[in-house]
Amino acid sequence: MGQSPVSLRLLSWLAYLGGGAVMVAQAVALSDGRQRVLPLALLLAFCSPYPVRFAIEGKSYALLVLLVALAWWWRRAERSVAYGVVAALAGLTHFYGLFLMLAAAAWDGASRRWHLAGAAVLGAIPALGWIIYSADYLFSARSGSWIGPPDFALLEESLARALGLWPLPKLLLLVVLIG
């Protein structure tokens, strides 16, 4: 296989398939035996444009989705050790995973599910340690130099992927209909 587009994206594809499978299994487990849940969950997990787009990139977004889906699975099963380990991996994969796990810890703490809150907080320690270790770089001007300035065209392109051509009038119509 060597260095090819396929080998570059293979991990993302596998993570996307794994994350989608976990999400579908979670939906079926929560469905209480309703027959339409499986095909709908399969459709949403494997035909949505956003996960498909992230699965074809050579980045860690699909891995983050897999880890967060596993974290929710173990959290629902109240398996604190597995939840904490996967929360740690999600936090180390992407900052969004860290903040999502900390939000879940706050929610679990407010709900007095101390074992789950503790597992998520303990799972956050490696990522918080990494942030402290790399703070000099993260807060320097050179850390975000590869990110372009905010651009209205990027917003419109993202909306067009979700809503189709001419997304702004459609979004305005949607806001008017909802409001």
Across the structure, where does each feature detected by a protein language model lie?
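Membrane-proximal helix-loop-helix interfaces that form the catalytic/acceptor-binding platform
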Residues: 1-31, 36-179
